[in-house]
Structures are given as C-alpha cells and as structure tokens.
C-alpha cells in the first residue's frame, strides 16, 4: 500500500485474531495505543474481553488511516465526530473549520475481522455517496440449540422485529443451494418440496431431473438455510448503516431483500495457508416501502468458510465495489502512522 491519498471506493479488511496476544489490551498493544486520541484509547480500554478490544482498536486504526489518506492530512490531525445523534450517529471526518469532510466511510467487526468501506470523490466529481458495510459469522453463535428445540421456522420468527413476514417466509421455506457431503452442489429449484423441511436430523431424498436420486440428512438443508439467513442479515445491516441508523431504524421491516443468494464459501486458514475468499454475489434486489430501490448497489463476499462481508453504496449505482484488500498491521497501518 502506497502513501498516496485514496480516491473512489475503498474496501479494507484487517484480521485481529492473531494480533496482540495476551489477556489485557493495555499490555498487549502498549506500542500501538499511543496512535489513538484519548477518547479512542479509552473506548478500547473499556472493553472487558480482549477479543472485543482488539476489534475496537483495529476499527479506530482503520478509520484514522482512511481519513488521513483520503484527505491527505497528517495522522495526528485526524478528527472524528458523529453525524446527527452524538452517540449513535454515523462517524465522520471533521475539517479544521469544524465542517464535515466530503468523504463517507463505515466500519464493521465480527468474530475477529474488521472491515472498512470508504468513498472519496475523485477530482472534478461532485457526486456524493453513502457507504455501509457489515460482517457476519455463520457459526459464531449457538443457533442450533433453539433450532433443535423448536425448529428452524420458530428460530426465524425470533427476528420478527427485523424482517418482514415475506422475508421470514422466504428464509424458512426457500434455499438457493445445498452442498452434499461429497461436495456436490444441488440447486434449490431441484429440491422439490424437500425445501419445506424445518427440522434437523431428518432423512431426506430427492430425485433430480436427470433421474439421479440423492439421500441426505436434513442438517445439510438447515445449514444452507442458516447461511442464507445470515446473508439476509448482512445485507440489511449494511444497508441501514448507510445513514448510520443500524437496527434502530423505524422502517426496518419495510426494507426487504429479494433474490438473496448466499455466496459459496472459501477455505479456512490452515497451518501453512491463509484463509481464502469465496464467491461474490451482487444481484440482490432491494425494496423499501414496497418500491424497488434503484440507487443502491450491494455486494456480498464470502471469506473462509463462515464469514460474509456486505457492502452497500448509495448514489453510485453503476460503480462496482472493488475487492476487499487485507491490510497488514505493521506494514500498512503502523508504518504509515509513524
């Protein structure tokens, strides 16, 4: 990564899972914390669990790095405020005269990963844009306990305050594909009414149009539905973070996603290899208050086996978000800040 300022869309990712080992971030990151303001540093130190502190620290570093490079100002001169609500509003960069800088950025973190998406209009382009990002981890929570007790349909209804009735029906009874134990992928439209199954540990059987018959455990179907649920969730979070409202948005259930596909996973990091990116999808349809949204472009990218990262860009419909760039803490962040 060079020292030049950033233009256009930027998508960054930093993995904190192996950073700052130990139990206390104050000791583990003593050589890094001085790069933050007092408020930023205190926010990191208030975290009880070091995993949360790592992500909070990485988030603060990414925001400072982006603002410094996008505005071409020294690291120490970066000032961050919030638009609207001083507590829950969307973070923004503040210029020396106290006005908001004409850039937009958003961060997300989950299970050790931290993402940043930013927009800085190129010279001569006055078009403004809003950006949002979100990260989900499919197997981070103990979702199966409730699913095993009450069924996948009842588990989905836990989120009735977040998703519309149509979205919840779609998640319960539709699936885009399942992956058999031998790696073969069966498209959802070949499953027949097997896709109505909402219980784990059931024996299922399908006959494909070719005449092939496949038998499998319903755990594979529920796994696929669960991954698709998190695709819905990731899209919704990224969209509502465009304006910084998050799940407080009063129009949450009026925001619906159609043609949702869960991107096929990458591979998890092994002893001698890094985790790999999986599929990227960008053909989701967004509906708000019953009307199709035309000015927002969304993408969903799989990373390793369980992560998915969403981007939302409003105001630049024809501009495709670039691939996420994984940053190295020492080479890309600390070296620049120093």
UniProtKB/Swiss-Prot annotation:
N-terminal signal peptide: none
InterPro entries in UniProt: 4-PPantetheinyl_Trfase_dom_sf, AASDHPPT_N, P-Pant_transferase_sf
Catalysed reactions, semicolon-separated: apo-[ACP] + CoA = holo-[ACP] + adenosine 3',5'-bisphosphate + H(+)
GO cellular component: cytosol
Gene Ontology BP annotations: lysine biosynthetic process via aminoadipic acid
GO molecular function, one term: holo-[acyl-carrier-protein] synthase activity
Recorded phenotype for the gene knockout or disruption: Completely abolishes the ability to produce any liamocins.
Gene3D superfamilies: 4'-phosphopantetheinyl transferase domain
Keyword tags: Transferase
Function: Acyl-carrier-protein synthase that transfers the 4'-phosphopantetheine moiety from coenzyme A to a Ser of an acyl-carrier-protein. The 4'-phosphopantetheine (4'-PPT) portion of CoA provides the essential prosthetic group for a number of carrier proteins and multi-domain enzymes, priming them for the acceptance of acyl building blocks in fatty acid synthesis and many aspects of secondary metabolism mediated by polyketide synthases (PKSs) and non-ribosomal peptide synthetases (NRPSs).
Protein name, UniProt field: 4'-phosphopantetheinyl transferase
Lineage: Eukaryota, Fungi, Dikarya, Ascomycota, Pezizomycotina
